[in-house]
Design a protein with these regions (language model features):
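Short, surface-exposed tryptophan/glycine-enriched loops
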Residues: 131-164
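N-terminal leader/pro-regions and domain N-caps
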Residues: 17-73
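Generic short beta-strand segments
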Residues: 61-69, 102-104, 169-174
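Internal, hydrophobic beta-strand segments that form the core of beta-sheet-rich folds
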Residues: 160-177
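Extracellular and analogous surface-interaction loops
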Residues: 87-95, 156-160, 199-201
Length: 205
């Protein structure tokens, strides 16, 4: 299984660069047929996914996502995840890839405590290849966070079909501690949000 990981610095990847078709705007039709989800961070009815009108951004938001530590907090609360499978439908002759993510939420972490959130993406049937965006918290953090990441390399969806199943897994964790720490939804919006930018191109005939 290949894993392309991005942290605070961009990792260079030694790989042959394949030839693609012309980069273009999005297809006229780009919709989410359905979404299935599972995980401790997204109880039923607390996750929502939408595509913006431009067809170049989709957003996953979670309204009950909370990771915490403290003197009476059980170990099950130190780490949470939510895995979504998005069945995407669009006009034939196009393919897309992810070119960046913005993650926003709330963190309250004291000195000496570390934490991180990992957003991993893969296409169903893509030989296990995936890309991971990692947001790390180290030392004192208090308040809203809004962090942007861009990949060094990412996979394109297949040209063999005008549908794709994109898997997204959001996993956040804190180091075990008796000190109170928290990664959770933003206090204003009431959501922890992962916003993804999409690049489209026409398939080679």
């Amino acid at each position: 299984m290949k894993s392309f990981i991005l942290s605070n610095i961009l990792l260079g990847l030694a790989a042959a660069v394949p030839q693609y078709g012309d980069l273009s705007g999005p297809p006229k039709r780009f919709t989410i047929r359905n979404v299935s989800l599972i995980g401790s961070g997204c109880p039923s009815g607390t996750a929502h996914v939408q595509v913006d009108r431009s067809g170049t951004i989709f957003e996953a938001s979670f309204s009950a996502y909370q990771v915490q530590t403290g003197p009476t907090v059980p170990a099950s609360e130190w780490r949470k995840n939510c895995k979504l499978s998005l069945n995407l439908d669009y006009d034939p002759g196009f393919q897309f890839r992810l070119v960046g993510t913005d993650m926003s939420g709330f963190a309250s972490i004291p000195d000496g405590i570390g934490g991180q959130c990992v957003n991993s993406f893969s296409f169903a049937g893509d030989n296990g290849d995936r890309i991971e965006y990692i947001v790390r918290f180290q030392g004192r953090n208090s308040g809203r966070f809004d962090l942007h990441s861009t990949p060094g390399l990412s996979s394109w969806s297949s040209c063999e079909s005008n549908t794709s199943i994109l898997n997204l897994n959001t996993a956040c964790e804190l180091e075990p501690s008796n000190h109170r720490a928290l990664i959770a939804v933003d206090e204003v919006s009431g959501k922890l949000t992962v916003k993804c930018a999409i690049q489209w191109q026409r398939c080679l005939k």
